[in-house]
Amino acid sequence: MARGGAGRAVALGLVLRLLFGLRTGLEAAPAPAHTRVQVSGSRADSCPTDTFQCLTSGYCVPLSWRCDGDQDCSDGSDEEDCRIESCAQNGQCQPQSALPCSCDNISGCSDVSDKNLNCSRPPCQESELHCILDDVCIPHTWRCDGHPDCLDSSDELSCDTDTEIDKIFQEENATTTRISTTMENETSFRNVTFTSAGDSSRNPSAYGVIAAAGVLSAILVSATLLILLRLRGQGYLPPPGLLVAVKESLLLSERKTSLI
């Protein structure tokens, strides 16, 4: 009888040890990870609110797997429309934070909701230049300065064409200026010439010069005539034609002097 009691005690101890070991093993085992759960039936929105339902297969995946850069649905529907996705699967938008989230493509909100905002930059000012691809405004004075300031280098495009156009405009302006200056100079010269010719008869100094020239001409002709007469008296007769020409010149000079 004592042997039977000892056997039962040994068996009970073995059972307790087995139960204790099983309990320890269960506690040490890792917690099960999130797994895909296939929904029975194809009814839409049959997944829990904290999961996302794949469009084609109907699997329910954790909502945190949505737009994480890894396709968890076979059709990739969990990675579609991620740029403008700002609300949860159930249509409830994320709560607003105390400070507004910025549209700088850098996560500044605790829920990373500003990464999914469909933002647009305000237009550039009149003194600024809009870069084509990177959507940035830079000062207009930076255009064609030999250094690309836009990421796409659009501020340094078509600079040669603009330079040639500026040169053409400058050359045309210079030519127009030269023509205008030449015409003004010619007009001024003509006005001065006409004024001098028109006012000579009314200018006392010009009148005196003309009168002096007439007197000198008469004296010169008279001296020439006297020389010819002396030569004739000495027997050196000049040709008759020369004497007649001298007399006519003397008469012409006297007429001019009388007209003045």
Swiss-Prot record:
Organism, as annotated: Mus musculus (Mouse)
- Where does this one sit in the cell? Cell membrane
Q: Where is the LDL-receptor class A domain positioned along the sequence?
A: 46-83, 123-160
- GO MF term set: calcium ion binding; cargo receptor activity; cobalamin binding; growth factor activity
Source organism phylogeny: Eukaryota, Metazoa, Chordata, Craniata, Vertebrata
Q: List the disulfide bonds.
A: 47-60, 54-73, 67-82, 124-137, 131-150, 144-159
Residue sites binding Ca(2+) 1 per the record: 65, 68, 70, 72, 78-79
Gene3D superfamilies annotated for this entry? Answer: Low-density Lipoprotein Receptor
The name on file for this protein is: CD320 antigen
Task performed by this protein: Receptor for transcobalamin saturated with cobalamin (TCbl). Plays an important role in cobalamin uptake. Plasma membrane protein that is expressed on follicular dendritic cells (FDC) and mediates interaction with germinal center B cells. Functions as a costimulator to promote B cell responses to antigenic stimuli; promotes B cell differentiation and proliferation. Germinal center-B (GC-B) cells differentiate into memory B-cells and plasma cells (PC) through interaction with T-cells and follicular dendritic cells (FDC). CD320 augments the proliferation of PC precursors generated by IL-10.
Q: What is its main location?
A: membrane
Glycan attachment positions: 118, 185
- Give me the segments passing through the membrane: 209-229
Q: Name one GO cellular component term.
A: endoplasmic reticulum
* Record key words, sorted: Cell membrane, Disulfide bond, Glycoprotein, Growth factor, Membrane, Metal-binding, Repeat, Signal, Transmembrane, Transmembrane helix
Please describe the quaternary structure of this protein.
Answer: Interacts (via LDL-receptor class A domains) with TCN2.
Task: Tell me a GO biological process for this protein.
Answer: B cell costimulation
Which residues are exposed on the Extracellular face of the membrane? Answer: 29-208
